[in-house]
Amino acid sequence: GERYLTDREVAELLRVSRRTLQEYRNNRVLPFILLGGKVLYPETGLRGVLEANYRKPLE
């Protein structure tokens, strides 16, 4: 099944602050689920965003 990550896990993974994650949520940059006041991020959704924004290095 789907794996869901917490704010802390995603902040560590992306090396950003939890406040930056809040901005990403506000601007709908990252997919998330709000469940009972807790924010969770689907791992496959995060991977999709990262892959969609991947830029190849210049040669």
Kindly give the residue locations of the regions a language model identified:
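Polyanion-binding surface elements
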Residues: 1-19, 23, 52
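Flexible coil/turn residues that form the inter-helical turn or adjacent wing/linker of helix-turn-helix
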Residues: 3, 28, 39
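Extended rod-forming repeat segments used as scaffolds/tethers
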Residues: 14, 30-31
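The DNA-recognition helices of helix-turn-helix-type DNA-binding domains
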Residues: 28-29, 53
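Short Lys/Arg-enriched helix C-cap and helix-to-coil transition segments
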Residues: 33-39
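A short, Lys/Arg-enriched interface patch at domain edges and termini
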Residues: 45-59
